[in-house]
């Protein structure tokens, strides 16, 4: 798109020393590159800025720096920031977003997923520290959120196990990110077909969202508030830094 309004789409390309970062976060970067290639000749409602951030694992340094360099005009012209982090391993595929009306990226993604029969859900709110539909500030969406920019966030994990904070990715092996198991060989052996399925679905979803997201055409209906159904289950602890 050539609009003065923009959507920032980002994924961090660094990883921790353990493993090789196949899930966290080569998977996110791969989907960003795929969607950028698909959309490069397609007209979109807004201009799209694709970014690979560095140093996420050491305090969100790349995204913090980028956000700190944005002018007031840049901030005003940014419709949303969409973050992709750790898409390959988790038992379930999720989309999160800002609370209330600013959660339009999440809401559109869920509507799109329902229409296309894609297996995408959102955080059900089992842990009251992370209300339904939202997530924590542990990834590259956080610096933009602090600027008041609405966010969307794609991730694969499992919010219904462990401490109910989205940190325990799988029932079979717990968390894979930040461990020596975060390699393509391990993931494909233990979860055959999951990488291909997840990255394909996330690519389709993100492409459709970026092609169709237009706030002028998506103004909320009067006197109706979209609510995300919360699940009911006790929780233990809150999620630590990702």
Language-model features: locations:
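Short beta-strand-to-loop junctions in surface cap/lid or active-site-entrance loops
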Residues: 1-3
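Alpha-helical metal-binding/catalytic segments enriched in His/Glu/Asp
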Residues: 5, 9-60, 206
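Extracytoplasmic/secreted envelope proteins and their assembly/folding machinery
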Residues: 6, 10, 29, 33-36, ...
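Solvent-exposed, acidic/flexible segments
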Residues: 6, 21-29, 56-60, 98, ...
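Flexible glycine/proline-enriched surface loops and loop-helix/loop-strand junctions
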Residues: 15-17, 87-94, 126-128, 137-138, ...
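Surface-exposed helix-capping loop/turn segments at secondary-structure junctions
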Residues: 41-43, 116-121, 211-222
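His/Asp/Glu-rich mid-to-C-terminal helical/loop segments that flank catalytic regions of hydrolases
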Residues: 160-242
């Amino acid at each position: 798109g050539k609009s003065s309004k923009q959507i920032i789409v980002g994924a961090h390309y660094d990883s921790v020393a353990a493993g090789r970062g196949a899930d966290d976060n080569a998977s996110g970067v791969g989907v960003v590159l795929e969607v950028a290639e698909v959309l490069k000749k397609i007209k979109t409602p807004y201009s799209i800025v694709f970014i690979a951030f560095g140093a996420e694992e050491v305090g969100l340094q790349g995204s913090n720096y980028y956000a700190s360099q944005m002018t007031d005009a840049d901030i005003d012209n940014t419709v949303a920031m969409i973050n992709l982090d750790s898409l390959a391993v988790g038992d379930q595929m999720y989309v999160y977003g800002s609370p209330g009306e600013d959660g339009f990226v999440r809401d559109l993604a869920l509507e799109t997923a329902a229409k296309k029969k894609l297996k995408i859900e959102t955080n059900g709110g089992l842990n009251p520290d992370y209300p339904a539909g939202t997530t924590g500030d542990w990834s590259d969406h956080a610096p933009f959120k602090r600027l008041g920019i609405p966010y969307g966030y794609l991730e694969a994990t499992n919010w219904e196990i462990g401490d109910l904070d989205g940190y325990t990715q799988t029932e079979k092996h717990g968390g894979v990110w930040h461990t020596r198991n975060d390699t393509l060989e391990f993931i494909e052996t233990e979860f055959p077909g999951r990488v291909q399925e997840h990255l394909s679905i996330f690519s389709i979803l993100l492409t459709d969202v970026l092609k169709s997201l237009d706030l002028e055409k998506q103004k909320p209906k009067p006197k109706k508030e979209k609510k995300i159904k919360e699940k009911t289950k006790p929780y233990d602890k809150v999620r630590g830094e990702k």
